[in-house]
């Protein structure tokens, strides 16, 4: 199958490397200088250093070439950040898009839209489209280590196409038609990873970490159901699976934000050290607003937003969380 991956960051590069072993894959990046350097070195030294490209992997900085490569029955996979999805979708608008899948997670700043809502707004809803999500660190995928992902789409044909293209020795693919549930799980888990980083950074122990992750999953489920997702989706790869990895993995950028906040660092300093804003930071304000709009109780999410945007100290915020009255666990 012809596959074009649009976005040459760490995750897009890792997936391109994995799929190039079995398919005709082109990796597109908007920065011509970065792509030329990657072509010459056969390595993405900027975003995924130390991993040599398969010989068959094609690279380009020409969007038209990437779309032509995918052809009428191939697959376009968008691997930009969520902030890059709207401008890229605008660039795709003049083209005939065959099948579209995105990897980005979150709610768009200002609009509070999920990725599929952005895509439908710009490209319409006639294109077979969906989200590929789940617990996956780019470095491990690039190393060929096993992982499992979920493809979510209203189109059964697209789900089958993605399973055919991506499912293989190192990547298992499970399919669902709950696009909203998968996208909400992928978005909110980043906020909870910041909370887990705060817990770990304050030295509050593994018991507290486990409690936070568990109660965090309840928050994700409540919001997801309120927005139209199905409760059972959040027990799967895009919910529980992604949450566990992002909250506990040492490669998690969002967890690093929480660790930095617990150490007394300012958010601006943490962003400089990371080199970019973690998606949980972008997402926290949107989720707080959505929870208020839909009357969803999300104390952990609200606590993270208070630390990020309202000037609360991590330690005081944790004390406030722990002072909440007891309640039924399943509610």
Swiss-Prot record:
Q: Which residues cross the membrane?
A: none
Gene Ontology cellular-component terms listed? cytosol
> GO biological process: any one?
glycerophospholipid metabolic process
The compartments listed are: Cytoplasm
Cite the annotated pathway. Answer: Membrane lipid metabolism; glycerophospholipid metabolism
Q: Which domain of life is it from?
A: Bacteria
- Any GO MF annotation of the entry: glycerol-3-phosphate dehydrogenase [NAD(P)+] activity
Q: What is this protein called?
A: Glycerol-3-phosphate dehydrogenase [NAD(P)+]
Q: Which organism does this sequence originate in?
A: Janthinobacterium sp. (strain Marseille)
């Amino acid at each position: 199958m012809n596959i074009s991956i649009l976005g040459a960051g760490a995750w897009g590069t890792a997936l391109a490397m994995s799929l190039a072993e079995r398919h005709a894959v082109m990796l597109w990046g908007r920065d011509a200088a970065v792509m030329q350097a990657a072509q010459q070195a056969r390595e993405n030294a900027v975003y995924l250093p130390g991993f040599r490209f398969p010989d068959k992997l094609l690279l380009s900085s020409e969007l038209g070439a990437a779309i032509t490569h995918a052809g009428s029955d191939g697959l376009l996979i968008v691997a930009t950040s969520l902030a890059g999805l709207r401008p890229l979708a605008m660039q795709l608008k003049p083209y005939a898009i065959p099948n579209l899948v995105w990897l980005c997670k979150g709610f768009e700043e200002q609009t509070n839209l999920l990725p599929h809502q952005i895509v439908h707004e710009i490209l319409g809803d006639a294109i077979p489209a969906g989200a590929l999500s789940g617990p996956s660190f780019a470095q491990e995928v690039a190393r060929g280590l096993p992982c499992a992902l979920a493809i979510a789409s209203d189109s059964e044909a697209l789900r089958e196409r993605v399973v055919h293209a991506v499912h293989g020795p190192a990547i298992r693919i499970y399919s669902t038609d709950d696009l909203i549930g998968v996208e909400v799980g992928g978005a909110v888990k980043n906020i909870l990873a910041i909370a887990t980083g705060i817990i770990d950074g304050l030295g509050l122990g593994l018991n507290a970490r486990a409690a936070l992750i568990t109660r965090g999953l309840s928050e994700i489920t409540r919001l997801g159901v309120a927005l139209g997702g199905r409760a059972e989706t959040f027990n799967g790869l895009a919910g529980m699976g992604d949450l566990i990895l992002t909250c506990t993995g040492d490669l998690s950028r969002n967890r690093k934000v929480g660790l930095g906040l617990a150490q007394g660092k300012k958010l601006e300093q943490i962003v400089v050290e990371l080199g970019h804003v973690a998606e949980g930071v972008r997402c926290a304000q949107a989720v707080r607003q959505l929870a208020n709009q839909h009357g969803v109780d999300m104390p952990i999410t609200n606590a993270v937003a208070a630390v990020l945007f309202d000037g609360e100290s991590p330690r005081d915020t944790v004390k406030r969380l722990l002072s909440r009255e007891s309640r039924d666990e399943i509610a």
